[in-house]
């Protein structure tokens, strides 16, 4: 598919006829759908979203206060596109890929209107090393060379929407992103920079079934409800249940090579937290600051609503670009509900027929359009790359039956349900293990067998069984107390408490417990299973539940979470536990 030309073309100017918040109507404007236009005397950036006869309806990505009918509107002739090339990593952009650092230097802490800034620095020079030579045939999307951007190698590619060709000359050395680095035999010239329309998914050779988990270091996610690389997940939850902290934990510790974090309509303080924390935190795989693998898109709640839609598309396009280099990318969108609310506002300004709860009828289509751009793929240059999308959903009052949550659940394959009751009990992450699910378990079964342990999947099923059994017994316990239960079920209640408090609870602010690798998760779960087996054997031998639940070694188990070199202390606890149970059985 040929994408619109990079250069803006001058067209006849239109005139503003009507203004309704972020939606304006122009007349006498020669425009196509999704053209980027400049609105008013201040040249505010907007996008054509509807054409009705001579009326061109535009959503404006900046505040429209003070503009009036009669002001000019000019069409750039381009669709909303992002600049892709060296310099993306460590950047922080607004929803339309204006670097906030550049805007601060231009106008201070408060963004003025009508200011444009390129997404990449056009002055900075990058050292380009070619990987192809003169005479080589290059296909669309082929890797031409490399730039050491941070600790990550940025692969410079031929745009995916051009014809194949033969390299005539290719240069090595220091260049800006605009300088020509390769000339093909048919005379076509290409720099390091590409521009790509955000609404058009970047092409791939084929989509594949995901079979490798995206490891996050969070026990409840990796252990019970894993997401695959190239998978989709939703984190719905009421206010204050920990959506943003969970998203930030995933951005910090997930084993993706690149992280794109979109703050879409959420509080500005949350983006500030990411900006202040990430440069000081070390990436566990590379040992470098986490910021070096991150692209941030800050579109906070006080920014114009129309730009929320742009921020989501900008983020996924940048993620696809890194995927095309053969990297695993994880994209966090916090929160897709704010984007849906922006759609609702724009839709009502357009006087469209509302759907459920006032959301537009095309809500489901837009959400699936976004989530379907995730996936594990074979790229055009025959590499394997993936984009994993994790979207937070903020249902008002924690009502999971509202349209955004329901439509999201229909699309995604992993559901991490945050629970206000758990967060009020200070159980974090507050993910409800009874309501959550992952549809990737079967696909990831073999990976866990080979890379963790052949009995990991059985251990996981056992833990889930114990937690479900506890939920069934909870009603009786609340009515008559746990002492009225049969002895075996008293032990089940105790083992479930251990799984909850030792395995599922995790402290995001503890230097060790914030990230837990799969081996440690397996060893912790195995220790709890050992206690369960020893307890059931002791109970069958006549030992009372009161004695079983008060053994000393068990009380030391929770401390293992906070110990980095845990192998020896854990082996000692298991040995002591065995000895104590032997003593109890002998006494019985």
From Swiss-Prot:
Assigned keywords, A-Z: ATP synthesis, ATP-binding, Cell membrane, Hydrogen ion transport, Ion transport, Membrane, Nucleotide-binding, Translocase, Transport
Chief location bin: membrane
Swiss-Prot/TrEMBL catalytic activity: ATP + H2O + 4 H(+)(in) = ADP + phosphate + 5 H(+)(out)
Any GO CC annotation of this UniProt entry: plasma membrane
Keyword field contains Coiled coil: no
Subcellular location: Cell membrane
EC number annotated for this UniProt entry: 7.1.2.2
A Pfam family matched in the record: ATP-synt_ab_Xtn
BP GO annotations: proton motive force-driven plasma membrane ATP synthesis
Topology of the protein relative to the lipid bilayer: Peripheral membrane protein
The keyword Lipoprotein is assigned to this record: no
GO molecular function, a single term: proton-transporting ATPase activity, rotational mechanism
InterPro entries: ATP-synt_VA_C, ATP-synth_a_Xtn, ATP_synth_asu-like_sf, ATP_synth_asu_arc, ATPase_a/bsu_AS, ATPase_F1/V1/A1_a/bsu_N, ATPase_F1/V1/A1_a/bsu_N_sf, ATPase_F1/V1/A1_a/bsu_nucl-bd
Record: residues binding ATP: 237-244
Family that this chain belongs to: Belongs to the ATPase alpha/beta chains family.
Subunit structure, interactors included: Has multiple subunits with at least A(3), B(3), C, D, E, F, H, I and proteolipid K(x).
Annotated NCBIfam families: ATP_syn_A_arch (TIGR01043), PRK04192.1 (NF003220)
Role description: Component of the A-type ATP synthase that produces ATP from ADP in the presence of a proton gradient across the membrane. The A chain is the catalytic subunit.
UniProt name for this protein: A-type ATP synthase subunit A
Organism: Methanoregula boonei (strain DSM 21154 / JCM 14090 / 6A8)
